[in-house]
């Protein structure tokens, strides 16, 4: 028996939404629809739109029993006594369908058309040389993504799609049904690396130069900017500019040898070893800052431009002092924010006219810069947030499964990603990520609750299986041995991971090699107990940081601008077959919305924190390449400069 679309949940007065569902049922849509019987993991393809899900934003510590799942034939979830007390006291409420939800989440299945990796099976960021948790693409598939689309594919773009794209072009939000129409022919994650390579190889500079020569000086873009000023703004700018990258976006070097640790080509080819693992204690985070130091932005990787052309364009202006800010992107963001504050203070103290500093912040860099904006507002003249997320649940993939750097699987292991403090700053505060594909309910979890991590197994370092293993080993150890091991752990807590030391393994009576059936990336250096303590501290520290980023009406903020992507299908969450699927790590069935391939267009900073912005510039570039879109960056600077001028005129009128 097949599930039916929830047309009865759509408001009667919303004729378009109803008609859209009806049309999708009758037309030759390629959208897949799930059968209730998922025993073999197969999809029953129907010519229907997937059912919508919704509900109010809820994160609670009570759970309602999943009666619908029993009615639909699913086996009742089995939970042990340690599973949140049968998971009913700690799992956030599963939200029933609600047509009045202001932000309906959609469950969308895609066909195999488009430049998206259909073999992708886990969340990832798809950054350069990282997050490649999918099977190797065939040469034919790679060639297909590089070649232009055929005329038949362009025919698919009907009038309705163009209308939706125009709404996105005008930075207008689109409904869930419109997202279905726009992205129903896509599947999988966007290949941001390939997109960045292709954009880097395009002759944008030459094309823009020709356009500038032939352009009417009074001609305007669709969003009201004079085309001639898109070129002249680079000469209007004056003062100090600091540009910073995001997650994995700064060069890291060995403090002693000055050798490049991130990212060396040899490491990606498995020709050398790189150790980016941080210990579980606060002292370990302090120690690693003495051993590994940042050294500027990662401006490009081979042919992939990230910010090199932008910096070159800014440097061409003699009235600008452009500096890069590199930071250790593994650390807690409050540490990086303090380092940025120190740098900005040094620049500010040298200014004769205390105007402050312009900041261009890409991705996670926006989270760092925003903290400085809150704490030391006077240092900042303006910020351009480039694809900066207020949340990004994609991080759950690297934490749970690890990810690769080219052909190297040992750099970003499950343990390394778990102990990267910065990873947790992407966790969704609204708890939204997982959707039940059968009952059409949304599972909203408090991702800042350690019990959620343990029960759902969001990291193998703190899951129930490892807890049981630690408990069994503890029962086998003699009391004296336990005391010796505990003392040993205390003495070595701030230097090396105790459980990885051979002498400690001998004390524990474990002289055997690691069992062959244990994967190499699940042989952990840190004990279960230490991992849990670390998780509790880190979640609390992260939550406090994120809570400090909201708009303060009592402060006078400088002009803030946003450059973001809204043309690339972007993962919003995963459809799962019950909570057991989450425990088993079956994050393989995604639902999407417009974004830059990493950050959804509704997750953006600072907008989601209640901040007004002087402009919100939509770009067609992917996440990695957003700063290479010089036209969009020029628009952002124009808006900031004009806002400054208007502010000065306003103050002059007030004083007079």
From Swiss-Prot:
Q: Which Gene3D superfamilies match?
A: alpha/beta hydrolase (3.40.50.1820)
For this entry, list what GO says about its biological process.
Answer: lipid metabolic process
SUPFAM superfamilies (UniProt xref): alpha/beta-Hydrolases (SSF53474)
Modified positions (Phosphoserine) in chain numbering: 39
Q: Where is this region: Disordered?
A: 1-41, 60-88
Pfam families membership: LCAT
Indicate where this protein is primarily found. Answer: cytoplasm
For the keyword Metal-binding, the answer is: no
The record ties this protein, via InterPro entries, to: AB_hydrolase_fold (IPR029058), LACT/PDAT_acylTrfase (IPR003386)
Q: Which UniProt keywords are listed?
A: Cytoplasm, Mitochondrion, Phosphoprotein
Q: What spans are recorded as compositionally biased (Low complexity)? A: 22-36
GO cellular component terms attached to this protein's record: cytoplasm; mitochondrion
Where can this protein be found? Answer: Cytoplasm; Mitochondrion
Indicate, by first and last residue, each region the UniProt record lists as having compositional bias (Basic and acidic residues): 62-78
Q: Which GO terms describe its molecular function?
A: O-acyltransferase activity
Taking the record's annotation, the residue ranges forming a coiled coil are none
Q: Keyword 4Fe-4S, does the record have it?
A: no
What does the miscellaneous comment read?
A: Present with 1230 molecules/cell in log phase SD medium.
Name the chain's protein: Uncharacterized protein YJR098C
Q: Which organism is it from?
A: Saccharomyces cerevisiae (strain ATCC 204508 / S288c)
